[in-house]
């Protein structure tokens, strides 16, 4: 059932609803705290992937969490320095240098603002369910695979701590539902490691934590214009990848919370957050679906306050409590992400009984989305491949739904009725569905039950008429209405008869 606090999508309403009760307020606080802890190792890892100092990623995440809490269209969604954007920007840093990064992030944010105001979010309706399932399942696989580096070639005690963490997260909800299991697991395992002097990899081993708050900088706009040709492709790629991942994450959270979010606002809000991150020398980012799942699904957070607190707690933890945070064993955080991966996977979509009922084409599209995403390690590429595959499958199905039937025949006139959608994919089959040895003097092509969509369909009808004219027949098109009639008159020289 929909949570009462999710009925206010506006910013003020969402923040106010966080204070509607002590239980809700407590949930938002715990959600922000657990999410901030889960952000630290992921952000540090993605910073290393992008080729920047881990402090850059942590400051970026603080600014973007705080920014999106006010500008975003999906309350409780977590936005930070994400891996998908890091993968796009990494070649820019590697091939051209760090000085190109901030102008590229600034440009990417401006592109996202423009696309958001231009209504790009409306394109979400063209992403089918099979692609969404593939996206979610691929994400679960990527989250799982990203943790393997932390459990390979490590001391054997790491596996013990992972097992303890997993056990706590499984058992704890049966004992207490107030405090999130992931937070309990992190605290308990950290205490065991410190008190037991257990030598295992920690958060500190992933990179240096900052010792102060981020300082404002003025992006070198002149430098950006001078090297626009270099940064533009990377900025455009990061903008599109970030938007796709954020909008898909927002849709996923909509399904979990049973609430519709403002995708247009999320689009330009993400752009504003990226622009803001550029003013602290940030690396750019987008929605972090793993951390969002921790916040929304595990912590049950529902308002903007949890997102705001995730950013605030992140900064406080790494600056004020950096020494303590640095001692958190990676085993605890890996276990948290394992649970996130397990719960993120749409098990119903891969159930053999479901797969047997689903059309083979939809299963193939879901599989293609998963494979493309995992192989490229890029969710946006997987979604694009899935949408293209789904489009091809749909076009193929619709193309075979066109029929031609001879409905009237006399020595003088023979009428053929065309039913279905006439467009580039179906037009070729239509041409070969007529009887060109028909002895009638006049051939009528009845399109009253058909829709003429493009020039390929018009060209096919002209080809049919030409074949009959070569045999001395008179050809006329009847039954055309609306847009089909307009296209036939504008694009062809066919004889069109109104009935």
Regions found by a protein language model. Give the residues of each.
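Hydrophobic residues within alpha-helical transmembrane segments
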Residues: 33, 63, 82, 106-110, ...
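Core transmembrane helix bundle of multi-pass membrane transport proteins
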Residues: 1-33, 38, 89-90, 94-257, ...
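Intrinsically disordered, low-complexity non-transmembrane regions of multi-pass membrane transporters
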Residues: 1-26, 200-217, 399-417, 472-499
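The feature marks cytosolic C-terminal regulatory regions of anion transporters and related permeases
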Residues: 344-493
């Amino acid at each position: 059932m929909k949570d009462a606090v999710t009925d206010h999508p506006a910013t003020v309403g969402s923040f106010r609803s966080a204070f509607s009760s002590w239980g809700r307020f407590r949930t938002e606080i715990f959600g922000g705290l657990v999410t901030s802890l889960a952000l630290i190792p992921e952000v540090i890892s993605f910073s290393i992937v992008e080729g920047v100092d881990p402090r850059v990623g942590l400051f970026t995440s603080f600014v973007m969490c705080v920014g999106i809490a006010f500008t975003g269209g999906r309350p409780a969604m977590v936005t930070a320095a994400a891996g998908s954007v890091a993968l796009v920007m990494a070649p820019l840093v590697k091939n051209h240098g760090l000085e190109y990064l901030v102008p590229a992030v600034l440009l990417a944010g401006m592109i996202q603002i423009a696309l958001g105001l231009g209504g790009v979010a409306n394109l979400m309706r063209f992403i089918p369910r099979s692609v969404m399932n593939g996206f979610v399942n691929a994400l679960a696989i990527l989250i799982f695979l990203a943790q393997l580096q932390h459990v390979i070639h490590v001391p054997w005690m790491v596996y013990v701590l992972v097992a303890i963490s997993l056990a706590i997260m499984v058992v704890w909800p049966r004992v207490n539902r107030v405090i999130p299991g992931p937070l309990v697991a992190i605290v308990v395992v950290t205490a065991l490691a410190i008190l037991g002097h257990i030598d295992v990899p920690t958060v500190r081993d992933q990179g240096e934590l900052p010792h102060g708050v981020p300082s404002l900088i003025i992006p070198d706009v002149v430098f950006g214009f001078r090297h626009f040709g270099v940064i533009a492709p990377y900025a455009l790629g990061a903008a599109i990848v970030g938007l796709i991942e954020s909008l898909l994450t927002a849709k996923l959270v909509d399904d979990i919370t049973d609430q519709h979010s403002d995708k247009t606002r999320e689009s330009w809000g993400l752009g504003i957050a990226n622009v803001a991150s550029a003013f602290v020398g940030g690396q750019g980012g987008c929605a972090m679906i793993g951390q969002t799942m921790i916040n929304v699904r595990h912590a049950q957070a529902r308002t903007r306050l949890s997102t705001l607190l995730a950013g605030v707690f992140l900064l406080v933890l790494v600056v004020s409590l950096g020494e303590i945070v640095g001692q958190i064993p990676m085993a605890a955080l890996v276990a948290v992400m394992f649970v996130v991966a397990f719960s993120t996977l749409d098990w119903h979509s891969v159930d053999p009984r479901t797969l047997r009922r689903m059309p083979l084409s939809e299963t193939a599209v879901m599989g293609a989305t998963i494979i493309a995403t995992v192989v490229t390690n890029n969710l946006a590429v997987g979604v694009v491949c899935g949408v293209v595959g789904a489009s091809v499958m749909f076009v193929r199905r619709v193309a075979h739904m066109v029929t031609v039937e001879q409905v009237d025949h006399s020595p003088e006139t023979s009428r053929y009725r065309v039913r279905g959608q006439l467009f580039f994919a179906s037009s070729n089959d239509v041409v070969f569905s007529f009887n060109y040895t028909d002895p009638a003097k006049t051939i009528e092509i009845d399109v009253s039950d058909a829709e003429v969509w493009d020039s390929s369909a018009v060209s096919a009808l002209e080809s049919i008429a030409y074949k009959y004219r070569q045999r001395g027949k008179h050809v006329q098109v009847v039954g055309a209405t609306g847009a089909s009639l307009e296209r036939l008159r504008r694009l062809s020289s066919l004889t069109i008869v109104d009935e």
